[in-house]
UniProtKB/Swiss-Prot annotation:
Official protein name in the record: Sulfate adenylyltransferase
Alphabetical UniProt keywords: ATP-binding, Nucleotide-binding, Nucleotidyltransferase, Transferase
Annotated catalysed reactions: sulfate + ATP + H(+) = adenosine 5'-phosphosulfate + diphosphate
Pathway(s) of this molecule: Sulfur metabolism; hydrogen sulfide biosynthesis; sulfite from sulfate: step 1/3
Gene it is expressed from: sat
Lineage: Bacteria, Bacillati, Bacillota, Bacilli, Bacillales
Annotated source species: Geobacillus thermodenitrificans (strain NG80-2)
Record InterPro entries: ATP-Sase_PUA-like_dom, PUA-like_sf, Rossmann-like_a/b/a_fold, SO4_adenylyltransferase_pro, Sulfurylase_cat_dom, Sulphate_adenylyltransferase
Family matches, as NCBIfam families: PRK04149.1, sopT
Length: 386
């Protein structure tokens, strides 16, 4: 077995820093999330996409979780403009893609269309409630979508995470250099506690390497900030993982909170990075009570192994059992819940912000120390952030 074939068969490359921008007069302003998507399309992380979705692909993705040609793709990657801006644009036009005054790309407009956002919300997020963060973002966006192939002409400033940004060509090269033929990807927007560590190490027993790929794009206000999380990942890997079996790199996309559909999307992207396997735990990419605990695992049954091209590894909720004296799940532990150390994410965040160290059966003390220090420092600067 060797590293996965890119989704769609070819790793897309839309990078051209020498693009003749002086020939392009029209502009479209990008949101932060669209800027991330632009770069991920351009570098091949979203292969086989070569641009923002046209209406045919958009409709197919929303309704069938496939592109118009049948390729598996579960999340609509779209570029939104206002009605006023849409009047300035026409099919066949080229437009600069601008963020913060800088030009990051160019789109060759192939389609201009008005989506049914309620339908998109209901099918992609399983709800049209504005309380859902993904739905709220969707309805905050302008009402017209522009589709077409892009060219990436400028890379974003990677800031403090620069050492952890890798394009798919780079991760594939690194995995090969490490001698890995099988690689399991792990997506997270949270600190890695003992339960996550347990399932990662279970997966490591059957593959050559682990690609820990935390998301550092836009998340909810109450999610633990990326800078604090990154420090916690580093201290965890330093103290508890074999250094030649783990690779840490960040994922710059925005979080959609689309649950099951986002699990498929996350798997396809990790396939492009070279992963042969992908971990799907309980309520992957979920929020609140919008999705069933294991809906993100069940959704994979809609597709054949061949069209997915990456092997999902499904794990149940794990915990420390005081009777077993170790990490376990209901698959391996016969004891009642009273013996299980389980804390909600909300409870843990509250403990950390109050300087309380969660039990070592839940979180490694080194990780807890980093999180407490980071959160308290942030609270001191922005006390209303809570």
């Amino acid at each position: 077995m060797s590293l996965s074939i890119p989704h769609g068969g070819t790793l897309i490359n839309r990078w051209n820093p020498d693009y003749p921008l002086n020939e392009v007069t029209k502009t479209i302003e990008l949101s932060n999330a669209e800027l991330s998507d632009l770069e991920l399309i351009g570098t091949g992380a979203y292969s086989p996409l070569t641009g923002f979705l046209t209406k045919a692909d958009y409709d197919a993705v929303v309704e069938t979780m496939r592109l118009a040609d049948g390729t598996v793709w579960s999340i609509p990657i779209t570029l939104a403009v206002t009605e006023e801006k849409a009047k300035e644009l026409a099919i066949g036009d080229k437009a600069k893609l601008v963020y913060g005054g800088d030009v990051y790309g160019v789109i060759e407009i192939a389609d201009i269309y008005r989506p049914d956002k309620t339908k998109e919300a209901t099918l992609v997020y399983k709800t049209d409630e504005l309380a859902h963060p993904g739905v709220r973002k969707l309805f905050e966006k302008p009402d017209v979508y522009v589709g077409g192939e892009i060219t990436l002409v400028k890379r974003t400033d990677k800031g403090q995470f620069a050492a952890f940004y890798f394009d798919p060509t780079e991760t594939r090269k690194r995995f090969a250099e490490l001698g890995w033929n099988t690689v399991v990807g792990f997506q997270t927007r949270n600190p890695v506690h003992r339960a996550h560590e347990y399932i990662q190490k279970c997966a490591l027993e059957i593959v050559d390497g682990l690609f820990l790929n935390p998301l550092v794009g836009e998340t909810k206000a109450d999610d633990i900030p990326a800078d604090i999380r990154m420090e916690s990942y580093q201290v965890l890997l330093e103290n508890y993982y074999p250094k030649d079996r783990v690779f840490l790199g960040v994922f710059q996309a925005a979080m959609r909170y689309a649950g099951p559909r986002e699990a498929i999307f996350h798997a396809m992207v990790r396939k492009n990075f070279g992963c042969t396997h992908f971990i799907v735990g309980r309520d992957h990419a979920g929020v609140g009570n919008y999705y069933g605990t294991y809906d993100a695992q069940k959704i994979f049954s809609n597709f054949t192994a061949e069209e997915l091209g990456i092997t999902p590894l499904f794990f149940e909720h794990s915990f420390y059992c005081t009777k077993c004296e170790g990490m376990a799940s209901t698959k391996t532990c016969p004891h009642d819940a009273e013996h299980h150390v389980v804390l909600s994410g909300t409870k843990v965040r509250e403990m950390l912000r109050n300087g309380q160290v969660p039990p070592s059966t839940f979180s490694r003390p080194e990780v807890a120390a980093v999180l407490i220090k980071g959160l308290q420092k942030r609270e001191a600067v922005t006390p209303s952030a809570r």
